[in-house]
Amino acid sequence: MNECPPGTRPFRVRHAAAELRQGGVVAYPTEAVWGLGCDPRNADAVARLLALKGRPERQGLILIAAESRQLARYLAPLPAEWAETIQASWPGPMTWVLPASTRAPRWVSGGRDTLAVRVTAHPVAAALCSAFGGALVSTSANPSARRPARSVAEVRRYFGTRIDALVPGRLGGLERPTPIRDGRSGAYLRR
């Protein structure tokens, strides 16, 4: 279980996790920008998150986790050589596009046979995944075509009371969103 980092009130993380379990959408800091998250198994929660952003389902979403076992249900078994490379990059700011399992919800994968996933090293995001007990949908906290939020004030300006909880904390220090790599080829899809 990931502990709450210093300066983060554990009750805020527990409250956000409770909101997630009830189908809520929450905001939290990540490696580079503020994120919006929800329970990936809850189609209504994902639809609400997508509506907040004005983002189509077909684009797919990223899942973050505190540890790789939280992602296992969503991913097809990986060849050993892939698993070694991927595991060596986690926890950390590397998102991988990997073959999805048949249990991966289409509303998260965008209807593709792959899924973008990351085991986060950000202490607040990891603590939230641990308190929730599983992986979360994670997307930048901004309406489509607007720049991602880099402060609590921007999150509030974009979404006001339309989100169910906000877990305070600092961003992880990256200037740009996490890189995304294709697990099959190793190619960078986003640097």
From Swiss-Prot:
Record's keyword annotation contains Lipid metabolism: no
Pfam families for this protein: Sua5_yciO_yrdC
Localization annotation: Cytoplasm
Catalyses which reaction(s): L-threonine + hydrogencarbonate + ATP = L-threonylcarbamoyladenylate + diphosphate + H2O
Swiss-Prot/TrEMBL keywords: ATP-binding, Cytoplasm, Nucleotide-binding, Nucleotidyltransferase, Transferase, tRNA processing
Family stated for the protein in its record: Belongs to the SUA5 family. TsaC subfamily.
Function: Required for the formation of a threonylcarbamoyl group on adenosine at position 37 (t(6)A37) in tRNAs that read codons beginning with adenine. Catalyzes the conversion of L-threonine, HCO(3)(-)/CO(2) and ATP to give threonylcarbamoyl-AMP (TC-AMP) as the acyladenylate intermediate, with the release of diphosphate.
Record protein name field: Threonylcarbamoyl-AMP synthase
Lineage: Bacteria, Pseudomonadati, Pseudomonadota, Gammaproteobacteria, Chromatiales
Gene that this sequence comes from: tsaC
